[in-house]
């Protein structure tokens, strides 16, 4: 079964068709989870050998122009898949349950608007998981001490990210130093846009420490 078949199954179950694949995450068993950004909040699951693709999870959207999840990642400590954006800042799915359902994560702090969320990553920090998502011009970090029933947040901002197509955060290690870069797509400067450089923007790594 290909993704078209999964989209057909979501449509059969819900009457709505997800599209716009944005990011994938892998669990410890090698299964992949693909998030859809458009049509509806939905996640497809693909087996390690790629032979089995299933309509794994979905929920109602919030009526926005981009109702689906914008990013997805895996936290090995809680054995949960975390989706970013869409109907809420953060949504958890427990892989310890046979039929995981979307579980809203309560945010302790001011997340701000949902518009503009992009990808999210898991960064290991001092034996724990910190999630960092992109929402121009901010990088927003999350940490939880209760298995993602709730999460605290921190933000850092760079004005260069406001109009550069800020889509993702990546972590780096330089000796003992752990840091973050913002990655931009520069949508206005595509293959024929004349841009000759594609910079990374260093972010304040203080958002990794709670």
Where are these regions (language model features)?
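Active-site/pore-lining binding-face segments in mid-to-C-terminal subdomains
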Residues: 96-98, 102-157
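Structural motif
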Residues: 40-44, 89-94, 137-144, 190-202
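Beta-propeller fold detector
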Residues: 1-8, 53-60, 101-109, 150-160
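Short loop/turn segments immediately following the C-termini of beta-strands
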Residues: 29, 37-39, 77, 81, ...
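Surface loops at the rim/top face of extracytoplasmic beta-rich domains
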Residues: 33-58, 71, 83-84, 91
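Short loop/turn segments that connect beta-strands within beta-propeller blades
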Residues: 46-51, 94-99, 145-149, 204-206
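Beta-rich, blade/repeat-based domains predominating
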Residues: 5-32, 60-84, 110-130, 161-177
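Blade-level signature of beta-propeller repeat domains, shared across WD40, Kelch, NHL, RCC1
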Residues: 168-210
